[in-house]
Amino acid sequence: VFEVIRAPTVARLYFWALQVSFVEAGREIGAGHTGLQWHPSAPAGAVNWGGYYSGGAPSGGDGTLPGTGSSLPAVDGGPHTRHFAWSPGRKYQFRVWSPAAGAWRSEVTDLDLGETTVIRDLLVEAHGLASPLVWSEVFAACDDPPTEVRWSQLQAREATGLAHTATSVTLTYQSLADGGCSNTETYAEGQCFVQVTGLGAARAAVPDVLSLAGDEGRAGS
């Protein structure tokens, strides 16, 4: 479940995503990412479901995973990003699953309204999913106004139906050399993992693992 607590205020792209890898014959053949976007070309909001093959497309091309169309209008003409109105303070649940062999669907449910929207299907010959993670990709300046988002109820389900809910995560940050900012942070609060940007100071030391259990609280405290 994903929620924007403090929305961006600048005309820059923010992408908050759930990413999964596609597995076939014991190896990961590609990955897809789905989530909400704050997008300069989509004033009411956008949603994305797209991805890439590992090591390039099997038959050449740019490595982009093929997919179906969508009932949602395209943003800037591309297949991945679609217009989707969303609001800060509302909870959205993303689900990636296979409705048919060779098809992997992402859908988003507005939990306040109880409405589910199918984004589109990616067409990948894979028998399962692996390596789930969530991330924030922010193209704003480090000193732009703060933002805050929350992730909760991170869950993976086996083919048998057995569900596994994450109670801890491994943290990574983009390095300063690669264009990252020192004033972003991820911490645990209640039953949520919180991601913030635009802090007034550099983040404290970063733990390798962040857990919801106990009283760990803010990362590095």
Regions found by a protein language model. Give the residues of each.
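Secretory/extracellular carbohydrate-interaction modules
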Residues: 1-68, 81, 180-181, 196, ...
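Activation corresponds to long, low-complexity, non-globular regions
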Residues: 2-12, 132-221
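Short, well-ordered strand-loop elements centered on a beta-strand within folded domains, enriched
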Residues: 13-15, 45-49, 103-109, 132, ...
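Generic structural signal for short, solvent-exposed loop/turn connectors between secondary structure elements
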Residues: 42-45, 98-104, 125-130
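Short, aromatic/His-centered strand-loop micro-motif at the edge of beta-sheets
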Residues: 65-93
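Extracellular glycan-recognition regions
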Residues: 83, 109-130, 209-220
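Carbohydrate-binding surfaces in secreted/extracellular proteins
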Residues: 86-118
